[in-house]
């Protein structure tokens, strides 16, 4: 990796943001030998041992105090590893104008943590090494500074955020939170509801922060209204409110607001497959607001999905039961274990969570996820049945149709179709307009040649409700093929392939249909496309077609 690669990636990521829409490892002893230390630091970073990399770079920075590159690498590695004390100590030795994006973010976070909002704003508005402008973050900090002082002009300050800025999608939630800080719950309510509607994956977090703000204003009714939803975190927050306590996890100062914004932006960048900056933002958020409840969950998730499972598990297992988002930490822990094929450990942990006195339906659903991953479909269906019983008894958790759909799917994979059909029909009765349910039940019937008229009707309705869903379009085309309308099927399957060319099942279906009408060259092209992403057992079937042509023995089911 060239010496400028890290800086360039930071510049690119922050430029996109500014203009966009919407457990440490033990460090072995090492000798300070100049070039060898540099090589060791880079190797440690590539190996994911950022703590060791930071210490090696820091030692090298002591030897070469004039090197901006070495200092920058040391600070970056320290921040990414979570050693913000080391990063701050190193940053203090450099002119602030030379510091890179990550260091400037940390310095701003440090000033906010100390209650020095003016200094934080000045840091963000100042020039950054590499030429990246962090000024787009400053209006939010300045608005929170005014809100903390009871200055109603805070709300107007938010208008300084450009409409195309990455901060813009989060203005509603911060505007509502600032109004609550200013003691204006009635004015805050409609804005709070808009914020919830736009929150996406962060909905539970936003709801809880707003509920805490309303409770701080002694508005219990509006606080409870903020906590509508089936997530366990919301259920736990409601329990606290109903006992007369605030749920906590509030956002009512500049440090908390800055941290929450960084966490939200880290999710955006992670979805855009930007690797280094989301980790920096999460670590800076944790420093600026050490009690930010979702920060350790996001950190664990990021580490786990970036091949650092042991560090992820240390972080996730450190999330206390008093954290409203501890169920999310448990979910992430299980996913992390499954990702690295530690299935038995994942099952043991999931069963332990499900055996807790306050276990809920989500805990049983988590057990089902692990069992399904292990191919134990009957046991997974049993766990989902227990989850369904808990929800039907009034507990929190997924909607009943979701659990019935999942349970039906597990029973179908276990070749217990009669029982699967009962669960799937129940899901349909509970969610008659849901395209996923309609498609699953219709396709399952289609595969078995059962009541083909109704099967096609179900799939056609699903397709009408979700015309952009490639899998459902594929189901419709396959139904048409099974009913003998091959030319119509080819047109529909071509539409499905255009929507998602990477789906092996779609390409195989298209190939079978094309071969049936003698378009063998095009069929081979579709089958070859299917081979790219097909699973092993499907590959064997497709390879047979490529070798011998379509036969009843190798036709798609």
Name each model feature, range by range.
Residues 29-37, 49, 64-71, 96-106, ...:
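Generic helix N-cap/helix-start motif at coil->alpha-helix transitions
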Residues 56, 84-96, 117-129, 151-164, ...:
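Alpha-helical repeat scaffolds
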